[in-house]
A protein has these predicted regions:
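Phosphate-backbone binding interfaces of nucleic-acid-interacting proteins
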Residues: 1-210, 347, 370, 378-381, ...
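A carboxyl-terminal module marker
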Residues: 2, 19, 445-449, 460, ...
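Glycine/proline-enriched, intrinsically flexible loops and inter-domain linkers
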Residues: 5, 23, 39-40, 201-300
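Conserved mixed alpha/beta core segments that line enzyme active sites in large multi-domain catalysts
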Residues: 49-80, 150, 249, 254, ...
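Class II aminoacyl-tRNA synthetase-like tRNA-binding/catalytic domains
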Residues: 114, 292-332, 336-339, 495-612, ...
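Mobile "lid/hinge" segments at catalytic clefts and subdomain interfaces of large enzymes
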Residues: 117-130, 136-142, 154-163, 167, ...
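Extended, well-folded interaction surfaces typified by the phenylalanyl-tRNA synthetase beta subunit core
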Residues: 181, 420-585, 735, 788-793, ...
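Terminal amphipathic helices with adjacent charged low-complexity linkers/tails
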Residues: 190-222, 399-427, 433-434
Length: 821
């Protein structure tokens, strides 16, 4: 946000430089990002002086140039070649001397001594547009006879010099979106730092405001009282629309605003002065002499000031007359109701619109204006009348006219100040040191907080309604410390704290480690919108549409619910990549999923039926590796995905030997597997079925895993610490078995039986072949298994090995009905 140094000084009795003010403001939390010099005339007419033409003849080598001698008060007159048709001997003129820099928009050039058609020229006799004094270029500017030769041009044509102060305003500081608001902090800081009370915020008086007649009364009706809790307006008749005076133009230009006309400029001036947005209508265009504040039907067409026809939402608050809309409330005016050169009567609007309503409307239309910027953050609802009167008086002063209606002030809300009690012990605790009570109280007073009660233990204040973010004791502490200065809070020499040296799982570190591992294996992380379309849950049998968390005012039907699964976004990302001919894909995504359970609803607890679960999802499709001469890529499959899932579990120090496996019953999978630990489900992985793939126009196989990250962290927390062992001194022995088993027996069952039979010297069991071909009975399959045996204390003998293998074989045969091939 930009403010003007000269403008700030209108309201405060101080002689600080712009740099000093910038330092003070930054100390209060209004961080000054830049200071930029402003000149109402670029270059400030430096090097331009009053001269007198004492000699003028036609140029011998030109049919339009003239050779002149100009007295500029120097020892010798200047020889200047001039092309103006109106130059003549005896004229007083403005001369740009050698070295003067003249500006034309964003371009500039420097006057140099040179020759024009063979004649020496030592300066330039200027037209008014060349000096930015006026707009005429019909000829040179001829001055009155009483102008003194040699005087600087700036003596007769004063240049406004100012400094533009750019403040990086945070979203919570709506009270500082104006010159008065910024000065409020400056006054408080100066009075505290100089231990005085001499600085005061002097706000222009509106006591002269009075209604002169009611000849142009306009009725105001507010239908949507929630979106418009307060609407004020007044009519001024008999105005003359025209250019603004220089002082008003300079104030607006210094902060980057373009002058339009006196009426519009006054609205902008009061906005930047008070922080209260205004809108000025041509009163004669308000049909039916009635202003109605309401929402219109979905799809209603409306042309805004920029000439763009827009379709309205039925939630967009509009300012209408008796027949049609005139303005998008708090955002942008309409093309038909604005002030023009022919306007003679104006209706001034000063309202308080609901911040949420304005924010939604602004985003809906993609419009960000000075008004919406302030309304979105929360304006002062009690500033409407002051701003209205201030604007009306300025219009009378600069455009004439009479105040020709009573003020309409429709109020549908409670705008009494928030009352907050601050205990001094709490202030000192939060500050980290003792702050004198008198200092704290005076700071609050200087910030316009009204002290209601003061005791030795606490102070109770009414917070000004401009401070929409101050409503708790902690907020008052922040207000005090901003002015007190955080740099005045002493840093203690020591900190008394109890340190817990027991290592705890770091969720972010674990997440980062898993992300790095997946990225190292060729995965790309994706981040999808938490909002998705309800149609997915309706078309996929796996999800209950009654559990959707629905958005009350969705931007579109594609973003009307919160996702129940990361699956939707992941498959959409794969679809987008397939459309760009990228088919070999490995994606992972961390994110929340959201559920509504009506059965969990508890009276008085608004969030009770809602649940969030943090998940990690994996997606793989296409080839498993890049195609190179040295290797042949294969299509990814279920076991490829399983490898990555087990790798994540290993990374989280979860003992995969203790995992419980079961067949999944998820309807969007062709087949699936579920991993659990002590009854707690950790992960489901499987192959996406064709019905689901068709929803996303996918024609290639996709494998997907969803992992409950919250449960994984619990399992990690319960996992035993990593145990280090010395390298084995004695050799390991491998023995293989080929077993015929029922088809419904899986490897995990075989493995568990083997370890149950022998858990001392059996170190691992691996499946290296599956065969279901000839000579294998129907309903059976052959597993080729390898068993690794090792004793950490001695070398295994053949006798021990054979005895152990016999025990393992016998257990498998008895418990799983297996036979040796």
């Amino acid at each position: 946000m930009k403010v003007s140094y000269n403008w700030l000084k209108q309201y405060i009795n101080c002689d600080l430089s712009a740099e000093e003010i910038a330092k003070k403001l930054t100390g209060t939390g209004l961080e000054v990002e830049d200071l930029t010099p402003y000149e109402s005339i670029k270059g400030a007419l430096k090097g331009v002086v009053v001269g007198k033409v004492i000699y003028c003849v036609d140029h011998p080598n030109s049919d339009h140039l003239h050779i002149t001698k100009v007295d500029v008060g120097a020892e010798e007159p200047l020889n200047i070649v001039c092309g103006a048709p109106n130059v003549a001997e005896g004229q007083k003129v403005l001369v740009a001397t050698i070295g003067t820099e003249l500006h034309n928009g964003n371009e500039s050039f420097t006057i140099k001594k040179g020759k024009i058609r063979g004649e020496v020229s030592e300066g330039m006799i200027c037209a008014e547009d060349e000096l930015q004094i006026g707009e005429s270029h019909d000829g040179i500017m001829v001055l009155p006879e009483d102008y003194e030769v040699g005087k600087p041009a700036s003596y007769y044509f004063p240049v406004e010099q100012d400094t533009t102060i750019e403040i990086g305003l945070t979203a919570n500081r709506s009270d500082a979106t104006s010159h008065i608001g910024v000065n409020r902090d400056l006054v408080a800081a100066l009075n505290y730092q100089e231990k005085t009370d001499k600085y005061h915020l002097v706000i222009p008086s509106v006591d002269d405001f009075k209604v002169e007649n009611t000849n142009n009364d306009i009725e105001v009706v507010v239908e949507d009282t929630k979106a418009c809790p307060r609407y004020s307006g007044v009519t001024v008749s008999g105005v003359k629309v025209g250019p603004s005076p220089k002082w008003l133009k300079h104030r607006l230009e210094a902060i980057g605003l373009r002058s339009i006309n006196n009426i519009v400029d006054i609205s902008n001036y009061v906005l930047m002065e008070t922080g209260q947005p205004l809108h000025t209508f041509d009163a004669d265009k308000i049909k039916g002499k009635k202003v109605v504040v309401k929402c219109l039907e979905e799809g209603t067409k409306f042309v805004t000031l920029d000439g763009v026809e827009r379709k309205l939402s039925n939630t967009n608050l509009m300012i209408c007359n008796a027949e049609e809309p005139m303005c998008i409330a708090g955002v942008f005016g309409g093309a038909e109701s604005g002030v023009t050169e022919s306007t003679t009567n104006v209706f001034i609007e000063s309202a308080y619109f609901n911040p949420t309503s304005v924010r939604k409307t602004s985003k809906y239309h993609g419009l960000q204006t000075d008004a919406s910027f302030r309304f979105e953050r929360g304006c002062d609802p009690n500033m409407t009348l002051y701003a209205l009167k201030r604007a009306a008086l300025l219009i009378k002063e600069l455009a004439g006219g009479t105040i020709s209606s009573e003020i309409k002030d429709v109020i549908n809300g409670d705008f009494t100040p928030v009352r907050v009690e601050l205990k001094f012990t709490y202030l000192n605790k939060i500050a980290g040191q003792e702050i004198e009570k008198d200092i704290a109280v005076n700071i609050l007073k200087n910030l316009d907080c009204k002290v209601v009660e003061l005791t030795d233990e606490s102070v109770t204040v009414d917070v000004p309604t401009c401070k929409v973010d101050v409503y708790r004791p902690a907020d008052l502490v922040e207000e005090i410390l901003r002015i007190y200065g955080y740099d005045n809070i002493a840093i203690p020499e020591k900190i008394n704290a109890t340190l817990n040296v027991v290592a705890k799982p770091d969720p972010e570190k674990l997440k980062r480690n898993v992300s790095i591992m997946l990225a190292s294996n060729g995965f790309y992380e994706i981040m999808n919108n938490s909002l998705t379309k309800e149609a997915y849950t309706k078309e996929m049998d796996s999800f209950d549409e009654n559990r959707n968390v629905k958005i009350l005012n969705p931007l579109s039907s594609d973003l009307n619910v919160l996702r129940q699964s990361l699956l939707f976004g992941g498959l959409k990302s794969i679809e987008n990549n397939h459309n760009h001919k990228i088919f070999d894909i490995k994606f992972f995504e961390f994110g929340n999923t959201y559920f509504y359970d009506a059965d969990k609803k508890q009276e008085g607890i608004s969030l009770s039926p809602y649940t969030e679960i943090y998940n990690l999802d994996l997606f793989i499709t296409g080839k498993d590796k890049e195609e190179l001469w040295s290797n042949k890529p294969q299509n990814v499959d279920f076991y490829e995905l399983k490898k990555y899932v087990l790798g994540i579990l290993h990374k989280l120090n979860i003992d995969v030997e203790k995992l419980e496996t079961s067949e999944g019953n998820v309807k969007h999978y062709e087949y699936s597997l579920v991993y659990s630990l002590n009854g707690m489900e950790l992960c489901t992985l499987g192959k996406i079925n064709q019905k689901t793939l068709k929803l996303f126009d996918l024609k290639r196989e996709v494998y997907h895993a969803t992992m409950n990250w919250d449960n994984l962290l619990k399992a990690n927390k319960d996992a035993k610490a990593v145990r280090y062992e010395p390298l084995p001194k004695f050799p390991a022995v491998r023995r293989d078995l080929a077993l015929i088993l029922d088809k419904n027996v899986n490897f995990e069952q075989v493995k568990n039986v083997a370890f149950t039979a022998e858990n001392k010297i059996l170190t691992s069991v691996s499946l290296f072949d599956i065969y279901t071909g000839d000579k294998i009975p129907e309903g059976k399959k052959q597993y080729a298994l390898s068993f690794i045996l090792m004793d950490t204390q001695k070398t295994l003998t053949d006798k021990v090995i054979e005895k152990t293998m016999a025990k393992i074989q016998s257990a498998i045969e008895q418990q799983l009905k297996a036979t040796l091939r």
